[in-house]
């Protein structure tokens, strides 16, 4: 029975690959493929669920495919099935089927018709990988696919300014959550000394002994998991990204931010509940986060002027209550609540255009202005203050910008001297010297070895920060990113005798190929358009869709999406950072936090936004 679990991944994967066979004009075939794939998945899950119930609800766990294995670490795909998986899988299949049926007509004659359905199928693949995942590595694969499809769907109207800006804002916070999940996985490797599966979390004796032995490490792991879950589910104080993420088509907003993806933070807490529920501190923290979110989001939702923002904050408030329910151990109630909220928000978003049209028409015949009186009471002043604060969304967006991103931008601006030609040559030479030092590592004194690995890791971090703040030359920014990743790998290799050439090759091979493809695309743009600066959005996807596609693939390979060996390389790289190496961990984590934002920013600035050549109709900047 458990051997059937991988087929729930194969079905959407095959559907996504088949979508490339059609061009944008084949609307009937494209939508038919999507409906057929999701419909087949829904029927398969339903039949499997009946058989699973007849077998008296066995918990299924299967180790499917081993990516990498040596004496100390094993990286493998694992799939897991229980009642939580069943609820999320059925919910996802039903809602995705409804949305693709609706989108068949809603997206009719849209310029990106094929692109929309291909992205939806990729999203559905990532969603299924996440909910069927049996360990953190498998979950992280689905988590990454969801983050990338989020960026693509928000920026679906890629010739407009606001969708691109909001896509970058959303993916920035998503990346912060990804790094938190990565750090939880890193510490989990060091405390369990194996690739722990979710099935093993059900063994109370093993988990209790593990917590007693590694209490401080467990605090770190669960804190990272809570932050990752809070970001994915837009909980306080990370709530501001969700309404901004609804810049894409209404149908993608319904499935992504109204019903499925936004609830995966709840899924993560449920899946790891057996690991953290015995520590009361975490239950209290989750309850406080959920309660604060429910209160603040409710106040914000009641005063917003746009229907999508109202629905977004209403959903955030309900998910806050789900966090409380999960922390209290009321999982059945939380799952019922989750399904009700998902169906309601999907319905609200899908009918919102027609409802708004009716209300706009109706107000001409039945408009009654509200009468305001003069009130000077203390209660009215408090009410007005809360109203004003809620209109500003409690300054959550501004606070996130000031706390998370402005310090990194400021530091990057102070490092602009690293972008001179002389500096690039010096860093390239130092990198070659470091490679030579790695080759003759046995002859290097241990004291110098410890200094060099920290120095190289710090240089890698500074280079990627400089690229992140670059506003002048896209090619130089790309070169800085390439150098930063090479320094990152070398920093780990210099310290660890067991980090060999083969392990370096896993990460370097994917990055090197992506670097060459990206460099070629930027060079072709510069040759045709004379300059590739980052001071504005150029919208070159209108003229060079092929280059835009290949450059996007290069960006995805750079950030380690699972279609390249870089994904395995990142896992191996982090596994060789020891628990006591706090400085090295900090430099590496910041590097991986910023690199995705930096490469996607280059992609967005060069290829997305308003086309610089006004030889055809273009959208207003405010659209």
Question: Which residues are covered by each model-predicted region?
Answer:
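...captures the hydrophobic TM-helix bundle architecture rather than a specific catalytic motif
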Residues: 1-571, 575-623
């Amino acid at each position: 029975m458990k051997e059937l679990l991988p087929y729930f991944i194969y079905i959407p994967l095959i559907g996504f690959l088949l979508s490339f066979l059609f061009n944008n004009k084949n609307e009937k075939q494209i939508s038919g493929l999507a409906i057929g794939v999701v419909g087949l998945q829904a029927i398969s899950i339903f039949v499997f669920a009946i058989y699973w119930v007849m077998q008296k609800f066995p918990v299924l766990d299967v180790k499917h495919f081993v990516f990498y294995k040596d004496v100390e670490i094993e990286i493998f795909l694992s799939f897991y099935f229980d009642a939580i998986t069943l609820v999320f899988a059925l919910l996802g299949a039903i809602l995705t089927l409804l949305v693709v049926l609706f989108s068949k007509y809603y997206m009719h004659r849209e310029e990106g018709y094929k692109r929309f359905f291909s992205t939806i199928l990729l999203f559905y693949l990532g969603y299924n990988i996440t909910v069927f995942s049996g360990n953190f590595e498998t979950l992280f694969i689905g988590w990454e696919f969801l983050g990338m499809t989020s960026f693509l769907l928000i920026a679906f109207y890629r010739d407009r300014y606001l969708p691109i800006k909001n896509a970058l804002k959303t993916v920035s916070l998503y990346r912060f959550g990804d790094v938190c999940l990565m750090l939880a996985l890193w510490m989990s490797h060091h405390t369990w000394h194996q690739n722990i599966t979710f099935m093993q979390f059900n063994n109370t004796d093993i988990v209790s002994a593990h917590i007693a032995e590694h209490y401080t490490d467990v605090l770190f792991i669960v804190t990272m998991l809570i932050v990752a879950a809070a970001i994915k589910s837009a909980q306080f104080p990370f709530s501001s990204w969700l309404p901004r993420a609804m810049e894409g088509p209404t149908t993608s907003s319904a499935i992504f931010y109204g019903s499925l993806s936004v609830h995966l933070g709840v899924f993560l807490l449920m899946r790891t509940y057996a690991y953290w529920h015995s520590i009361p501190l975490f239950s209290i923290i989750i309850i406080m986060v959920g309660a604060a979110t429910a209160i603040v989001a409710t106040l914000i939702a009641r005063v917003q002027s746009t229907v999508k923002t109202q629905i977004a904050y209403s959903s955030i408030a309900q998910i806050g209550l789900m966090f409380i329910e999960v922390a209290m151990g009321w999982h059945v109630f939380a799952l019922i609540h989750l399904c009700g909220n998902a169906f309601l928000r999907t319905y609200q978003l899908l009918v919102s255009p027609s409802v708004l049209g009716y209300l706009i028409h109706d107000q001409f015949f039945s408009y009654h202005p509200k009468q305001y009186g003069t009130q000077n009471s203390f209660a009215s002043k408090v009410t007005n203050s809360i109203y004003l604060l809620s209109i500003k969304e409690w300054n959550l967006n501004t606070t996130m910008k000031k706390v998370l991103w402005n310090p990194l931008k400021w530091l990057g601006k102070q490092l602009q001297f690293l972008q001179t030609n002389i500096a690039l040559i010096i860093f390239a030479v130092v990198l070659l010297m470091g490679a030579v030092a790695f080759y003759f590592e046995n002859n290097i004194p241990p004291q110098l070895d410890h200094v060099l690995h920290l120095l190289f890791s710090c240089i890698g971090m500074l280079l990627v920060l400089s690229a992140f703040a670059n506003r002048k030359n896209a090619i130089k920014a790309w070169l800085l990113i390439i150098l930063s990743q090479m320094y990152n790998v070398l920093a780990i290799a210099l310290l660890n005798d067991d980090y060999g050439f083969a392990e370096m090759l896993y990460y370097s091979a994917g990055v090197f190929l992506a670097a060459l493809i990206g460099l070629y695309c930027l060079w072709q743009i510069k040759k045709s358009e004379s300059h590739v600066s980052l001071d504005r959005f150029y919208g070159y996807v209108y003229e060079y869709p092929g280059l835009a596609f290949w450059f996007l693939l290069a960006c995805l390979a750079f950030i380690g999406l699972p279609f390249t060996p870089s994904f395995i390389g990142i896992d191996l790289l982090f596994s060789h950072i020891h628990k006591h190496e706090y400085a090295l961990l900090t430099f590496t984590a910041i590097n991986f936090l910023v690199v995705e934002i930096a490469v996607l920013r280059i992609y967005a600035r060069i290829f997305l936004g308003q086309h610089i050549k006004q030889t055809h109709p273009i959208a207003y900047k405010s659209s």
